[in-house]
Amino acid sequence: MGVALWLCPKRNTPTYDKLITVMSSLNTLFPGSPPKFEPHITITTNISLDLADQSKTKDDVDRILSASAVAMNSLPKNHESLVKLGNVNSQRKFFKKLYFEVEKDPNLVSFARIIRELFVIVPQDIEKENIKQNPQLYTKDNNGNTIRRKPSKKKSKTTEVKEFDTSFIRQAAAYKAAEWSVQEFDPHISLVYSDLWPLHSALWRNINTRISDIDWDIEWEFGVLKLVLCEGDVNDWVVLGSVDIH
């Protein structure tokens, strides 16, 4: 997943408190110790971010969060709530073991499409083209992945870099993002991460009982946007930065 953008309800709100309560309760129904995590909707994963240079990482995080906040605040104010919860569902996947479906609100879909285009597809496709145009800037790591060469500390002849037009790449990215938002974007709020499968009928009865104990007539507009490094164990995930949306 790499770096993901999350949309979270604000802390100390009815939505946040209810989700935390039911997530903690449901965790006890599953074997082992399922990892704990914040309630969130994943807007997109695989955001392009330079994690090698910490000073540059901070600038990139601030830039992405600022642009994301602008994009969200520019959405049409044509209805009350951006996020509306649907049914509880389950899949075989670890990260979608138990979750609330979230309605594909047109504004939420538009926001996800914008973020996917600007911070996933465009940088990835420009990098791919740069590898073709300027292979001298890249090398292979021990796993055979193409990575940028580190600048040499030795004085050497300046490497000539070929410039190329990115307008077509950016244009194509808009179409790719639109297609992704329709076919792949699946907004949801995970409740439990687990390897357990299938969920037997007795477990489902307990799940439904615990969920029905809470008034789920909740929805939220805006909230908090967080960039999260989702690598390794869930308990090791790191929030790189956040911004409140008003």
Swiss-Prot record:
Residues 133-159 are annotated as: Disordered. Pfam families: CPDase. GO terms for cellular component: Golgi apparatus. Residues 147-156 have a biased composition (Basic residues). GO terms for biological process: cyclic nucleotide metabolic process. One of its GO terms (molecular function) is 2',3'-cyclic-nucleotide 3'-phosphodiesterase activity. The active site is at H40 (proton donor/acceptor), H188 (proton donor/acceptor). Keywords: Golgi apparatus, Hydrolase. Residues 133-146 have a biased composition (Polar residues). Substrate binds at T42, S190, Y193. Gene3D superfamilies: Cyclic phosphodiesterase (3.90.1140.10). Its EC number is 3.1.4.37. InterPro entries: Cyclic-nucl_3Pdiesterase (IPR012386), Cyclic_Pdiesterase (IPR009097). It catalyses: a nucleoside 2',3'-cyclic phosphate + H2O = a nucleoside 2'-phosphate + H(+). It is an enzyme of class 3 (hydrolase). It is found in: Golgi apparatus. Belongs to the 2H phosphoesterase superfamily. CPD1 family. Involved in the metabolism of ADP-ribose 1',2'-cyclic phosphate which is produced as a consequence of tRNA splicing. This is 2',3'-cyclic-nucleotide 3'-phosphodiesterase.
